[in-house]
Each structure stands twice: as structure tokens, then as C-alpha cells.
Amino acid sequence: MSSQKRQSTLSRFFTTIKPSQSTESTLTEKVSSKSPPLPPPPPPPTASPSLPSEKLLEFGFDGTKDSTSTRTTTTKSKDVEKRKSTTSSGSSFSSESKPKRPKEKRLTPLEKQILELTEQHQDKILLIQIGYKYKVFGINALKVSKILNIMYISNDIEDTRFHYCSIPDTRLHIHLQRILSHGYKVGVVKQIESTIVKQIEKTSKSSDVMRREVTGVYTKATYLGDESNENTKGSWDGLSSSSSSSSSDVPEYIVCINEVSEKQFAIVAVQPLIGEVIFDSFKDDISRQELETRLLYLRPVEVIVITNGSSEQISGPTLMTLKLINHNCNIIHKSGSPSENGNENENENENEAIEAIMSKYLNEKLVEYYSINFSIPIQQCFEYLLLYLNEFKLTNIFTIPENITNFQDSKKYMILPANTLNSLEIFTNTTDHTTKGSLFKLLNNTKTIFGSRLLQKWVSRPLVHIQDIKDRHQAIEDLQSEYNHVVDSISNFLTKIKYLDLEGLLSKIHYSSTNNNNNNLRINRKQVYLLLSNLQEILILVQKFEKSIKSFKFKSSLLIQIFDELLTISQTDIIIIENFLSMIDLSFIDCKESSEQCRKFFKRNSFDSIELQYQNIAQYQQQIEQEQLEIIRKELGNSKLKYVQKDGERYLIEIRNNQRDKLSKILDDKDYILIKSTQTITRYRKKSVTEYLKLLQYHEEMLIKTCDEEFQNFLKDLDSNYTLFYKIIKNLAIFDCLLSLTTTSSLPNYTRPTLIDDDLTILVKQARHPTIEQLRPNYVANDININIEYDKNRVLIITGPNMGGKSSYVKTVALLTVMTQIGCYLPCQNATMGIFDSIFIRMGANDNILKGYSTFMMEMLQCKNIISMMSNRSLIILDEIGRGTGTIDGISLAYSILKYLIESEFKPLVLFITHYPSIHVLEQEYPNQLVVNYHMGYQEIKNNTPGEIPEIIFLYNLCRGVVNNSYGLNVAKLAGISHDIIKQAYRVSEKVKSDIELKEYWKFAHSLNKALKEGGSSSPNQLDDIDYYILSKHSSL
């Protein structure tokens, strides 16, 4: 029979086999009855693909993977041949033939199991373990095959529910992360029993399918890294798998937003990787500026939005804000019943309902804590997050109150609004939205993942207490002052663990400690050992330098606290870590297989239950390797006979084929089972050995099960010391951040600022923009002289040519303020800085099409928010207010807004950039230099050619006075606009100026004529105006 015809026979056989003769592994895709309509299956290929022996094994024909013996299927092949279609094996249905509906047939046990699982989990993609592969069935298989670029297999099965794609079980987490990155929720279904355990314990009928359960559910934000693949080289040598997601610079938050009313909001955010919980309540308007600020900090990948009972959908402004922050964000809508306007009884009922749900996941003490300390809208967020995270086994995140923080703790931190974060490019630049050129990129010299995470919090929330700021400045000075071998040693240690996220590993232990399912632990054994061994190493290092630490002359209380706490722990609590490590057998490090790591992780004498299983294994090994082997030697008359192991089959005996005939009667009489035959030898196993081998395999399975149970208990004991471990890691993170700021502060020409708490002084000599100077070494420095001690220079009106450096100057002022209060030195010769509690910036032309707002509307909304939120310690920067509308309206609004800020009772510090020359009159309206006009310096070079614009040279330095010309035509020339267009624009510009001057002359002539006619009746003020006009015109000529 030809190869093609033989393959056609097999292919036909797979589709027509009776249920009683089928195997589990002949399955393909599954689509539940509630799934959307499926596309038609792809036409079969013109030639059937070959099915080598490896492919048959994949389908389960090896007798070890939920399958019947291959011999059974072979005996039926002739019957299948008779039922073959008369059509050729490679042909498909003709175009004229009608598609046939799949024949109704009884489903195999595995098919039924797959359908039941997918019916129960229609909201997720299921990766189902079958043998040594994970398979995806139905329409989900089509999605996954495209994501992973793997084969989508139909095998000519008409029922598309059983078309599938598959991945090796050893590559589960690698492929899982790729699927999650596309926004899907994924469930992992594992076989939770083995064939041998099933046979020995007889837990179910022998014909039943293997038990399978969903052991883990994941999304992009709830996946905490490679939790079980201990056979990955990177998880040990590179230390990088401790938290694959933690390596990202942007934390992945899950946020719950409660729309209590149109203007009142509550929010709770969780970061599962490190167990952080952030809450807040705030008022907002239709622009959702406050919500946008919080979302920019959190950058959520999953959002739950709770709306009140009267609203059936998320409000438009909220939805648009979410999409603008992250258009790939997964948004879940929940209907709630916020009780902002309810009466007392309604509040009590709501509170009781929330407590009833929370009590299912938290103990009574914690439920009471949440009920007492948080408002009902915040409690509702906690409630929905508990319900949501329960599916992912992450409710433990709410069991550590110390990890819960308030977003806007105004007593300790300055909260930078969304516009400020974007305009100052704090975390990302405005060009390609990467970290290049951002302030965080400049400051982030951390050596560890958890240190970088903490520094991000420091940058996003500058300090407002002068003593806290001085402590960080002093720490930098102490670290800079002289070489310290202790500091250098700890710094080297942090460099060594740069890929190991100790904070993330500790959170994984916390989640796993209450997870009773050993198939879904969040952390593996190598990661546990790495955590403990590195914590021990740093404490031993501190012990080694005990005398040096005690003799430190640090002035910084922050550094003193770090070393004192580490030294105390090294003296009193290191024994706890040592006790845990004493239970671990270090030989497991060299094990490659995860089952071998499991067996060898603990020392045998650490747990009686493990030792008992080893004794059982030794008993059956002795039966096979000594007693049974002796019997075999006597029966076969070979005293030197030894067992061999081939292809994973243990305890085989080999007999050469030329001796097989002599021993055939003994082999038959003594129950020797033929295992495999080759051209030269035949391998057997004695039936009694097979029985003992089953018992041996059973106890080996029991050993793994017992080791897993003891590992679970081990994690619970570790979690009971969570506070101790967290204190060590937190101190290391703070030290890492201080080293990072020290590195930046050690750049050339950086200096420590002098702090003043009494007023909003900003006095800086030769200030430089911190990020631009890294990109442009020839950056022009400027002095900053803002001293409002006597209410002088409180408002700066800045004019000047386009591209003259106005925006760069005001951004420098703001960035130096932020850097000061983060605790970093400044790029300047010297500086005296006041302490601000807020920085507001309105800069740039930003329309918002999705929100339906024009540039001018966004401008006015942002100005309104600034006016409503400013304080007596605010720095306000406004850039070209009023340019989004007509000139008259723009000037009027710019003048009025600035005048309001000048006269406000809060007296904020204001930097006002404008191209409206008439605004400069405010300097004359307010005496004592309260308002001062400045402009960016330039040099104009006259062009003698008629009709040609003058050339200008930008000097980029700040000068006193006002400039009336913005030199926009010069910018157009730099941009490459056609010379003819620029010449035409220059002629129009000159004509407009001439017309304006002519009108002013006519006005002057009219006033002069009137004065002459009236003789001496003219008022002194009127005559003064005429004199002033004549003098001004004369000086201009």
C-alpha cells in the first residue's frame, strides 16, 4: 500500500472510530453552545499529512497518556478500510456538493470533560493538559494559534469544537505570557491525578477519564511571573524569572473606580506583584482632571467601574479618560448603590451588606478595620476587588493593613497633577513617550528592581516637610563625603541581585501561604531559596561590619536608621532565616527536573512524613533490586544478570536473540512480559517486578505529594515572618534610592540647595535644565531671582521671540523645585529654595477630540482647576493663555486671569508667558516690583535688502523688559517655509503695522486739534498724554 493511501486510511480511521475504541488524545477543538457562530473549517489539504510515530504519540497512542493500547486500534484498521470513501484520499468536497452536517456520535469521556470545562469557563481561554501537552480547543484555538504562530489542527474532524492547537508542557509559562499580553483571561487546566495513583487507590472506575481541574486563572495584571517552571535556566542563573512582570518600569495596577455621583469619586488601586493598595476620595468636574491625574500615576491595565443604581453605564467623560490613558485597558462595569445621598438607615444596610461579603474572604478583625477606617464608597471598591481577585487567588493582598496608603497625603507629599507630569516630562517624554529625556531617567540609577519601584514613588510624590528633605540631602552629602567600605560592599551586593525582585518574591510567598492547591503556587522552590539565602547574606555582611557601622559619623538620620535596623535584625533575628535554610538540601540546586527538585528540596530528616515515604520507596526498591533480581538470576541461570533501563522503562532484563529460543519455555512459564524487541536483543520484565514497580511508582508519587504539602506548610511559616523580611527589603530599597540620587548629584556642577521654609524664594545662580543639558552640552545657563519675602517678583511676565527659550526657562524653575523636594542636588552654582506644596502648569496647545473639547476649552478647564486648587504655597506656570480664541477675547481673558492671581488672597508664585504685549501694563499697575516684565534675550541683525526680514540670534538668557515682536516669520523661515511665502507675509506684516501707526497718528491729530480749539480748557491729564505720545514717537524715530 502506498504511503499516501496508508495515511488516508489512518486519517479516516481517526474520524470514524467507535467511542469504545477511541482515545482521549484524538480530540480537537471545543466551542461551547453559547459561543458566537464559528467560521467554516478550513478545507483539507490536497494531500494528507504524514503521521510519523512521534505524531501518533502526540495523539496519545503510547499507552501512558489517557489512551488505550495501540494494538486495539490496529486490529480495527481493516474494518475501517472497508468503510473508506470511494473518493481519493487527497480530494475534498467538490464545489457543487453540499456541505454535510457532522454526524451525531457518542462523545468519549475526555470529549465530555472538555465540553464541561469550557461550558463552565466561557469567559476565558483554557489551556488543558493532556499528556505532555497543553491544548486549546474550539474557536479559542484559532486565536491562540495566531498569537503563538503555531499550527491549527483539524485532522479532518468535522466538529470544529475539537479542532485544536497545542504547546509543550515545559513551555507553558512562556506561551502563557504571550497570550496574556494580548489582553485575554487564561485558565490553566491540569491533570490532578496520575495513572498509577488511580490504579493503586482505585479512586474511580478504570474506564473514567483522568481528573482535570482549573488550577490557575491569569490576566496581564494578575500574572506574577514564572511560578512553576523550575526547569528554566534563567530562573536560576539569571535570577530573572523571580518576577517577569516586575522588570517593567511601569507597575501594572488593577483599579476600582466608584462613580458616587457626577462630581464625587472613590478609587482603590492594587498592585498584585508587591501587594500595594492605594485608596482615595475626591471631587472632579466634567474634564476629569483629578481622575486623569490618578490614572497617570497608576497606569492601570484593568479597571472596574462602579456606577450608582440609577446609571446603567459608565459616564462618557470617565470612559473617555480611561481610553486616553490606556486604550488597551480592560474595563469592567459593575452596578453599585453608592449611598452618598442616602439616609442613615440606607448607609447602615449598605455597610452590613459590604461586611457580609468581606467576611467571606477576611477575618473578623480585618473586616472591622475596613469598616471603621474607610467610607462606604471606598468599602464598595474593596468589596468588588475582593470578588474580582478571588478567582485569581489574590485576596490575600488585603490582609496586610500596613501596605494600604492614601494617594493624597497632603501632609507629607506634593501631588503633581496630570498636566504637570506631562509638561515637565517627569516619567516619559512628549515626543515618543519613552523614558529618554525624562526626569525619572536622569534620577534612576538604582541597582535593583524594588529600588527602582520605590524611586518612582519618590519622584511622583515630592516631600513637603523641610526636615524630611534635609535628611535626604544630608544622606547624599554623607555618601559623597568619603569612601566607605561598608557602603561599597552593600552597593556591590545590590548590584549582584539586580534581577532578583525580593519584594515581589515576598508577596508571592504571602499569596501562596493560604493557597491549598499545590498545583497553583505563586512561587517555586528556587525562588524561595534565593530569597532566604540573599536575606541571610546581607545580614551576615552587616554583622561583619558591626564595628564600622557603630563608628559611623553619618549626620543623616535616614542612613543611621537604615544601618541600625539592619544591624539589630542581624543580631537578633538572623537565626530565623538560618533555621529555614537549615531545612533545605542544597543538592536540589543541581537538579534539572522539577520532580527531582521537589523530592530533594528538603533534607530527609527535616520532616517525618517525607522520611516515611523514603522508607516505603526503599522497601520496594529492595524487593525489586535484590530479592526479585536474585529470583530472575536463578530462573534464567545467569548469576551476573543486571537490570537495564531504556527509553524511560526501568528494571528490564536483556536477552540476546540467539539465546531466546533456549529460554522461551522458562520465559513463558515464569510470566516474563515482552517489552521491546530489536534485531539483536529482546527486553523483558518479570510480572512480579511489574507489580512491585507499580507500588514503587505509587510511593514515588506519594513522596512528591508529601513534599508539596510540606512545602506549602513551609511557605505558611515563612509568611508568619512577613514583617521581618519586609523590613530588611524596605531598608535595602531606601538605601538603593539614596545611592541613585547620590549618583545624579555627583554629576559635574551639581550643588546642594539651601532650604527656606518661611517663603517661596527661588534664588538660583547659573541654573540649567537638568534633562536638556544631558542632550545638549552647550546649554545656556540662567539666573533665577524670585524672592517674595517682601512681596517682590511674585509674578513674572515673560515675553520674547518664538523659540527664544521661554518654555525651557519656566520648566527649569519647576524641575529644580521638584528635584529639590525629591531630595536631589541641583544643576547650578548655588541655590536657595523655598518649599512648595503644589505645582500647576498650563502649557501647550492640547485639544481632546475624544472628550469633545477644543484647545480653548481644555485651556479654560485647566485654568479653572488651577484657580480652584491653588494654595499659598503654589507655583503656577501659565503659557500663552488666551491664544486658542480671538485676539480681543484672548487678551481680555489673559489679563483678567493674571490679575486675579495677582490679587488672590493665596498669593501664589506665578510665571506667565505671553505674546500679548499689552499685558505688560500690569507692571505699572502694581508698585514695589510685585509684577516684573522679563524677556528672553536675542540680537536682531537688520537686512538691507528691501522686503527681507531681519535676522535674529537667540541668546537664551533672561533679561528685564518687554518685547513687542515675536519674530514668528523667523521661525517660519527656520521651519523651511517657502521664501516667497515669507516675503509676502513680511509685506503684510509691515502694512498692518503701518496701518496701526496711521490710526494712532490720526487719533493723536484729533486730540491735538481738539486741544487747540478749546485753548486752555484742556485738562492737564489730556495734555500729558499728548506730550507722552509725541515724546514716544520722537524717540522711536
Swiss-Prot record:
SUPFAM superfamilies assigned to the protein according to its UniProt record, in alphabetical order: DNA repair protein MutS, domain I, DNA repair protein MutS, domain III, P-loop containing nucleoside triphosphate hydrolases
Q: Which PROSITE patterns match?
A: DNA_MISMATCH_REPAIR_2 (PS00486)
> Region Mispair-binding domain: start and end of each range?
102-221
Picking any one GO biological process from the record gives:
mitotic recombination
Start and end residues of each stretch annotated as Disordered: 1-107, 229-249
Per the record, a Pfam family?
MutS_V
Q: What is this protein called?
A: DNA mismatch repair protein MSH3
What species is given as this protein's source?
Answer: Candida albicans (strain SC5314 / ATCC MYA-2876) (Yeast)
What gene codes for this chain? MSH3
